[in-house]
Regions:
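G-domain G4 guanine-recognition motif of GTPases
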Residues: 94-96, 118-135, 155-163, 168, ...
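C-terminal non-catalytic scaffold/interaction domains in large multidomain proteins
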Residues: 229, 371-639
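Conserved nucleotide-binding/hydrolysis micro-motifs of P-loop NTPases
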Residues: 72-73, 96-100, 115, 124-129, ...
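Beta-strand/loop-dominated core regions that host nucleotide or nucleotide-derived cofactor-binding catalytic loops
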Residues: 220-394, 491
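Conserved catalytic-core segments of large NTP-driven translation/proteostasis enzymes
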Residues: 2, 125, 142-297
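Conserved Switch II/interswitch segment of TRAFAC-class P-loop GTPases
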Residues: 62, 69-74, 83-135
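P-loop/Walker A NTP-binding module and the surrounding RecA-like catalytic core of P-loop NTPases
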Residues: 10-14, 18-26, 74-79, 98-101, ...
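Conserved G1/Walker A P-loop phosphate-binding module
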Residues: 1-69
């Protein structure tokens, strides 16, 4: 099987019966209406797909796949599923009818989505006559002014006679040549699903637009938002089986491991490296989004209303929570949208908002944060959050976007979450290296200015501690927490201070750098005191608690001596290393000389100690390979 050739994907738009399907049939030689009912009624009901090659130059062509959308207002949800994922549009207006109701609403929708107008075709030119056609061409150009389609050339065509079709093909080829490239094909894999069905012998088939990334036969995939895993059994693009396909492409995917009833329009196919099983990490599913919203001139947008969100091929009802009051007609604002159904929404996705009661498009916008913090309460907090969202909306580059995303969460955000938002760990870490305001620590990305008071609190607590003693780590964590530091971040901040030599670590406890000479001197006094107590009668050591209390030595400093091998713990007793070595030598020169065996009582008498000390000593010598024991007698092992 081959690798699918690159293609451009274009959606149609325009009023019902203005000749969209007929124009595509003339351009491609293919029938876009799939259903018998559509052909019988001459009315597009659902999405149709056709394709063709357009000549750019004598030896260069561009493959174009067309998504034919319905123009009837009763099927607007289907229309939105088509244009919701396609960046480029062929806008159609009939010369005889001229600009009509759905022409206007389709233009509003396309402008809200920021779609690029490739070409506008004024159809039925011969039926309307040259004068009427010229009027409509001029009118379409005027109506496009100030919208995302304003640079679209407007051409007169007639699908029946073929008038203007060659010019339209040339304009399409010229406008589409090289429009998409490596940036889209190298991005995170994402396929918006618009159909799911079953084929006998093959199983589940889904179709949709691969908007970015790659898919290959054998790939493991996840269907979002429910997170069901599947495997790519086969791929088809433009009617041919292929081994792999890259965005942007229309593609049919044969999925193994899923029934077709488990997949529906509005689901998204993701690769596992871009989909987290955590509900807090965007890409797989989200139930709330912060958005920038533009209200159309005829409609205010507020809390009250039956709002329907359309994004990608998906739709759901939403609760509307404007941040700073209702958004007036023709103005912009920010809002929190709470989704009735989780959707696989990402940063930067564009959407359309419709009033279900009035069956009217009222606005649209862009997703600024698909994993927002808890909705801010109080006017001051809402204003602060709105300013941060302004910063996000205005961000023109990746570093500014990252800073704004961190600010949107109060100056601290999960590294995993940011990586998912931005397309991967490598993308995030490369950008963070150039952002002076932020640092990554303990799985979080944090504003440096926020960290400063936390580190100051840690250092201050270390300074205030007695110079002769090290501070427990928990005490420094508590000091940082009192200044608002999350407890999960404080240990990493302490480790950073140790690495910067502002703190020194001894046995897991901390000492301020200025206290270190005093501490080391006091520690040596304590160590010497303990060793003296143990060596006063080396093989008859004192009670450990009594000895450590007398030396005023904390347990972690005792552990340091144990770790260094200066002191040895034999069950509940402490011996110096030299005492252990001396005990072994006495056995070797005494009852165990020349390979003789001996009893525990003989060892005890040789050492002139008690059974309390002798038995732990003998067990230590056995476990360290100095002696052996057969159940009754001990024997010194030759070194």
């Amino acid at each position: 099987m081959d690798v699918a050739a690159p293609m451009e994907v274009v959606a149609t738009a325009g009023h019902v019966d203005h000749g969209k399907s007929a124009l595509l049939k003339r351009l491609t030689g293919m029938e876009p209406d799939r259903w018998d009912e559509e052909r019988r009624r001459g009315l597009t009901i659902d999405l149709g797909y056709v394709w063709t090659d357009l000549e750019v130059t004598g030896d260069e062509t561009v493959t174009v796949a067309f998504v034919d959308v319905p123009g009837h207002d009763g099927y607007l949800t289907n229309m939105l599923s088509g244009v919701g994922v396609v960046d480029q549009v062929l806008f159609v207006v009939a010369a005889d009818d001229g600009w009509s109701a759905q022409s206007e609403e389709h233009l509003e929708i396309l402008d809200l989505l920021g779609r690029r107008g490739v070409v506008a075709a004024v159809t039925k030119a011969e039926l309307a006559g040259p004068e009427r056609t010229a009027e409509v061409v001029d009118d379409v150009g005027r109506r496009f002014a100030g919208t995302s389609l304003e640079d679209s050339p407007v051409l007169a065509v007639d699908s029946l006679s073929g008038q203007g079709i060659d010019e339209l093909r040339a304009a399409l080829a010229n406008r589409l040549s090289g429009w998409h490239g490596g940036t889209v094909r190298d991005a995170a894999t994402r396929l918006w699903i618009d159909r799911s069905f079953t084929v006998t012998g093959a199983g589940t088939i889904v179709t949709g637009l691969l908007t970015a990334g790659h898919l290959a036969v054998g790939d493991e995939v996840i269907v979002a938002p429910h997170g069901r895993p599947a495997r790519v059994r086969g791929l088809q693009s433009l009617g041919c089986s292929v081994a792999s396909v890259a965005g942007v492409s229309r593609v049919a995917v044969n999925l193994a491991g899923l029934d077709h009833t488990q997949v529906e329009r509005g689901n998204v196919l993701l690769t596992p490296d871009r989909a987290s099983v955590s509900s807090r990490v965007p890409g797989l599913a989200t139930s709330a989004i912060d958005v920038q919203l533009r209200a159309l001139p005829h409609s205010p947008i507020g809390r009250r209303g039956a709002w329907h969100l359309h994004v990608g091929t998906a739709t759901t009802t939403v609760e509307m929570h404007p941040l700073l009051g209702d958004i007036e007609p023709g103005s912009h604002g920010h809002a929190r949208l709470v989704l009735a159904d989780p959707l696989a929404i990402r940063l930067g996705d564009r959407f359309v908002l419709r009033d279900a009661g009035r069956r009217r498009t009222v606005g649209g916008g862009v997703v600024l944060d698909p994993a927002p913090v808890q909705r801010p309460r109080g006017a001051e907090r809402r204003l602060t959050h709105a300013l941060v969202l302004d910063e996000l909306a205005a961000a023109g580059d990746l570093p500014t976007t990252i800073v704004a995303l961190v600010d949107a969460h109060g100056g601290r955000r999960s590294h995993e979450e940011l990586a998912s938002l931005l397309g991967g760990v490598a993308v995030l870490d490369t950008a963070l290296a150039e952002i002076a305001e932020l640092t990554a620590i303990a799985g979080q990305v944090v504003r440096r200015e926020q960290i400063a008071p936390w580190t100051d609190a840690i250092v201050a607590a270390a300074v205030e501690a007695p110079a002769e003693h090290a501070v427990q780590r928990a005490a420094l964590v508590a000091a940082a927490a009192d200044r608002g530091c999350p407890r999960e971040l404080a240990p990493a901040l302490i480790d950073n201070l140790v690495a910067e030599r502002k703190l020194a670590s001894y046995g897991g406890r901390l000492v301020h750098q200025d206290h270190e000479p005093t501490y080391l001197e006091a520690r040596e006094v304590r160590r010497t005191g303990l060793l003296a107590a143990l060596e006063a009668d080396p093989l008859q050591p004192p009670d450990p608690a009594e000895a450590t209390a007398r030396a005023d030595i904390p347990s972690f400093e005792v552990q340091e001596l144990l770790d260094e091998g200066v002191v040895v713990s034999c069950e509940a007793l402490l011996f110096t290393r030299s005492a252990i070595e001396g005990a072994a030598a006495q056995l070797r020169d005494g009852p165990g000389r020349d390979g003789r065996s001996f009893t525990a009582a003989e060892a005890r008498d040789t050492w002139n100690t008690t059974r309390r000390a002798a038995m732990p000593l003998l067990e230590h010598l056995r476990t360290t390979g100095v002696t052996s024991f057969d159940g009754t007698h001990h024997r010194v092992i030759d070194p």
